[in-house]
């Protein structure tokens, strides 16, 4: 069987420059090629008429151009939105699958995309960790997710993605080179699809060395930290990575991020019944957040099959919220999206190994 040629879209932009210059071509040829791949979204070297025939033939002999595809989707309509929350199964060129979600809200439509196939952090409330870590995604595979979801949105609803969050499967800061390269592509104002970096967020479990590095880079993306508990032993019990990145060190890192970037941090706190919803938990969160330039995003838990956690009762979550507000913290409450379609990360990939229903019409 003939060996598949490497996918040229798997290169970061610096890697693409090195590949093209190694063929004796000037670096600007790589910039032209990159624009055709990620702005024009060409699928054949023959279409790239801005470069000469000899180079097109050379590239065709050593590289392929392959694109991810939408394999399936599930939708959940809400009364206050014309556009449903839609969860997609995205198939990569090697048949690896990840998840991406379109989330409508007032005045915005957010694409939640994956940065890894699986995850190595094994957060106990997350379905992705149950699938294990398989590989990092390339920057091209991340941009493909955005383009595919944007195409779906344009075709069915005549709208476009307004925000992007790297909050799907995987830990973005453990694949930082390709995540940042994808962000550079998605925010290139010379490309057909372009979004301000201020409309792009990276969500992390709190990988301190990479947070420190991100603070020193010129990118203007937003940072969200999955906190989920401000009590160290409790956080370790639901997020094993917290043992390596303890709360005092994390708080110091976030304060430095505030200072160097001038940007606030979002602390994401998912309420879990009888796990992190007590008055003591609220007090610990207030103490952790009080001196930081931050806002807190409280979210409901989407129940996951074969995982023990449960959503918090409404009355208890309201008391928790009131404790934070009374302490002067800025808090937003994110209502649960996609409960009926298993929108929590990792569930659709797990189910895809068995059977998926046809896309609703």
UniProtKB/Swiss-Prot annotation:
Binding of S-adenosyl-L-methionine, residues: 170-171, 203, 226-228, 302
KW Methyltransferase (keyword) present: yes
Compartment(s) where it occurs, according to its Swiss-Prot or TrEMBL record: Cytoplasm
Co-factor(s): [4Fe-4S] cluster
SUPFAM superfamilies: Radical SAM enzymes
Catalytic reaction(s) noted: adenosine(2503) in 23S rRNA + 2 reduced [2Fe-2S]-[ferredoxin] + 2 S-adenosyl-L-methionine = 2-methyladenosine(2503) in 23S rRNA + 5'-deoxyadenosine + L-methionine + 2 oxidized [2Fe-2S]-[ferredoxin] + S-adenosyl-L-homocysteine; adenosine(37) in tRNA + 2 reduced [2Fe-2S]-[ferredoxin] + 2 S-adenosyl-L-methionine = 2-methyladenosine(37) in tRNA + 5'-deoxyadenosine + L-methionine + 2 oxidized [2Fe-2S]-[ferredoxin] + S-adenosyl-L-homocysteine
Family per record: Belongs to the radical SAM superfamily. RlmN family.
Misc: Reaction proceeds by a ping-pong mechanism involving intermediate methylation of a conserved cysteine residue.
Gene Ontology molecular function: any one: 4 iron, 4 sulfur cluster binding
Function according to Swiss-Prot or TrEMBL: Specifically methylates position 2 of adenine 2503 in 23S rRNA and position 2 of adenine 37 in tRNAs.
Cofactor note: Binds 1 [4Fe-4S] cluster. The cluster is coordinated with 3 cysteines and an exchangeable S-adenosyl-L-methionine.
GO cellular component, one term: cytoplasm
Entry's EC annotation: 2.1.1.192
Pfam families: Radical_SAM, RlmN_N
Domain called Radical SAM core: residue spans: 105-340
GO biological process: rRNA base methylation; tRNA methylation
Keyword line: 4Fe-4S, Cytoplasm, Disulfide bond, Iron, Iron-sulfur, Metal-binding, Methyltransferase, rRNA processing, S-adenosyl-L-methionine, Transferase, tRNA processing
Active site positions: 99, 345
Disulfide bonds: 112-345
Top EC class for this record: transferase
UniProt-annotated binding residues for [4Fe-4S] cluster: 119, 123, 126
The protein's name in its UniProt record: Probable dual-specificity RNA methyltransferase RlmN
Record-linked PROSITE patterns: RADICAL_SAM (PS51918)
